[in-house]
């Protein structure tokens, strides 16, 4: 079993960080969210001079048994086809990783296809997709623990290379379904308030998806499961891998850059296991997927961008990175009033 020892950042440095930010040559609070981000990263790293080094993006791939119930407009073959596309540098995630200097790691957690011919994809396949949670738990406990461990060890590898900020993405057709269910169960909301169109379902298809997922949730509770059991019961291998990565990153006091609906749902699930993980999360964007805005509000999360994105892969998180970089540069490179020989006027 993988254990995580996560502590909330020590707040003793907070006053000094705020003083440093307020003494920069600007009206207090005039750089808004940049000041908040600089403060958060300073607390995470326990320093008055936070920094970003060797950013890494982990992209976990996996298929879902629930896809067999026609809850997604995209066929499951798209998962493996896109994973191969990523090895060729042709995906949105590739572009933004190149643009912003992220090292990209592709991980097969449970894609329903043999990808061993592609050495750029790290083979951690647990199974050829999860079980169909309409009828059975998506994974057993051994698979759940294994997925957590894989995610954690991948972060350990990044940390050993000097990485202190991690971004996480996913590729898994139908993974909006477990995300919606987690949101419903963990936030105690009706499922119809948490469901979205995924890759583009129409109204009739949405109603079918809702009926399938509601039946699965009803069966889950009828069997006496507790809310925390929803993580392995409904989750995908790629999603649990992401949770393990988030928890280990928090344990190592790394910044966690959270993407859209799927990754926010993973952070929500991670917080059910270790609430302290939330202090390490920066939310890159609010996606166009139904339910994400409400989820972020319930998590007291403030996304940096709202661009109508719903691609996944971690693309929205990666697009927000320059803002985070600007916040760190602000606290380190901007003159204070004394150095700039400017009268402090507040």
Residue ranges and their predicted role:
Residues 1-346:
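N-terminal loops that bind phosphate or other acidic moieties
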């Amino acid at each position: 079993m993988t254990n995580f020892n996560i502590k909330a950042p020590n707040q003793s440095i907070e006053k000094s960080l705020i003083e440093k930010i307020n003494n920069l040559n600007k009206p207090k609070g005039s750089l808004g969210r940049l000041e908040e981000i600089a403060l958060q990263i300073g607390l995470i790293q326990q320093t008055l001079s936070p920094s970003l080094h060797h950013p890494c993006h982990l992209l976990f791939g996996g298929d879902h048994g629930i896809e067999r119930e026609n809850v997604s407009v995209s066929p499951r073959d798209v998962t493996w086809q896109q994973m191969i596309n990523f090895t060729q540098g042709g995906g949105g995630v590739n572009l933004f990783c190149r643009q912003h200097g992220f090292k990209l790691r592709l991980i097969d957690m449970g894609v329903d296809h043999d990808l061993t011919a592609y050495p750029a994809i790290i083979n951690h396949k647990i199974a050829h997709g999860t079980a169909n949670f309409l009828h059975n738990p998506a994974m057993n406990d051994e698979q759940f623990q294994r997925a957590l461990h894989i995610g954690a060890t991948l972060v350990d590898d990044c940390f050993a290379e000097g990485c202190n900020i991690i971004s996480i993405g996913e590729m898994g057709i139908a993974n909006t379904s477990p995300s919606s269910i987690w949101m419903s169960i963990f936030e105690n909301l009706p499922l119809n308030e948490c469901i979205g169109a995924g890759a583009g379902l129409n109204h009739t298809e949405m109603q079918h998806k809702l009926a399938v997922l509601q039946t699965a949730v009803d069966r889950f509770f009828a069997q006496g499961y507790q809310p925390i059991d929803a993580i392995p019961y409904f989750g995908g291998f790629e999603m649990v891998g992401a949770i393990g990565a988030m928890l280990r990153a928090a344990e190592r006091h790394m910044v966690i850059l959270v993407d859209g609906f799927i990754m926010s749902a993973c952070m929500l699930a991670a917080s059910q296991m270790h609430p302290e993980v939330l202090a390490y999360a920066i939310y890159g964007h609010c996606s166009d997927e139904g339910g994400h805005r409400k989820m972020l509000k319930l998590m007291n999360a403030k996304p940096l961008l709202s661009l109508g994105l719903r691609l996944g892969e971690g693309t929205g998180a990666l697009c927000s990175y320059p803002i985070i970089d600007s916040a760190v540069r602000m606290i380190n490179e901007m003159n204070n009033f004394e150095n700039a020989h400017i009268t402090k006027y507040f």
